[in-house]
Amino acid sequence: MILIVLLPILLAATWAFINIRGAALKQQGLGLVSKNKG
């Protein structure tokens, strides 16, 4: 019963973590590209 409650929370937390990390990596990548061009 507890698992059924925790599973969606775990999935949401993992998904949010991946999204935040992906956004940070994209920003870093864009920064590196602009630095290389400059």
UniProtKB/Swiss-Prot annotation:
Cited Pfam families: PsbY
Any one biological process term the GO annotation gives: photosynthesis
Keywords annotated in UniProt: Membrane, Photosynthesis, Photosystem II, Thylakoid, Transmembrane, Transmembrane helix
Membrane topology of this protein: Single-pass membrane protein
Any one GO molecular-function label of the UniProt entry: manganese ion binding
Subcellular location: Cellular thylakoid membrane
Keyword Cell membrane: no
TM region(s), chain numbering: 2-20
GO cellular component, one term: plasma membrane-derived thylakoid membrane
InterPro entries: PSII_PsbY (IPR009388)
Main location: membrane
Reported function: Loosely associated component of the core of photosystem II (PSII), it is not always seen in crystals. PSII is a light-driven water plastoquinone oxidoreductase, using light energy to abstract electrons from H(2)O, generating a proton gradient subsequently used for ATP formation.
Family: Belongs to the PsbY family.
Subunit architecture: PSII is composed of 1 copy each of membrane proteins PsbA, PsbB, PsbC, PsbD, PsbE, PsbF, PsbH, PsbI, PsbJ, PsbK, PsbL, PsbM, PsbT, PsbX, PsbY, Psb30/Ycf12, peripheral proteins PsbO, CyanoQ (PsbQ), PsbU, PsbV and a large number of cofactors. It forms dimeric complexes.
Protein name per UniProt: Photosystem II reaction center protein Y
Organism listed in the record: Prochlorococcus marinus (strain MIT 9313)
Gene: psbY
